[in-house]
Amino acid sequence: LIDWGLAEFYHAGVEYNVRVASRHYKGPELLINLRQYDYSLDLWSVGCVLASIMFAVEPLFKGDSNTDQLIKIAQIMGTEDLMQYLRKYGLLLPDEYKGLLKNFPRKPWSKFISESNLFKCPPQAVDLLDNLLVYDHQKRLTAAEALEHPFFKL
């Protein structure tokens, strides 16, 4: 699950390379070239792994390229929250997304729950997922907050 080949110590305010992480687990901040990312990037990846386990899909977001990866995320997470995230931080979508990123509604997690995976999807797990897979990196749970989540009290 971990590739230490690109590991670095984190220093707040430092700009990092966005060409890190395995594509299907990349947080949206990497896909829009936000170079001042932080630990919250790892929590997005944890959410991707959790979703794969819960919904028995590998991976949840399966883009064919970095550009397609953000489109796959938007097809599930919706476009509206992505646009709010961009506006909040004064970010622009890279040019390669022009004409490709449509107005996708957010899909509820219930669309991914079936009889065969229901036993892996208690409400606490769905709530944890909902707080990890968040466009806005500052609104995602931290690792400490995630460990205090009711899911881990089951």
Language-model segment annotations:
Residues 119-126, 133-154:
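Terminal C-lobe "cap" of eukaryotic-type protein kinase domains
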Residues 1-23:
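Activation segment/activation loop of eukaryotic-type protein kinase catalytic domains
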Residues 57-65:
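Activation segment of protein kinase catalytic domains
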Residues 29-41, 55:
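Conserved end of the kinase activation segment
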Residues 79-130:
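C-terminal lobe substrate-recognition/regulatory segment of protein kinase catalytic domains
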Residues 43-53:
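A conserved short alpha-helix in the C-terminal lobe
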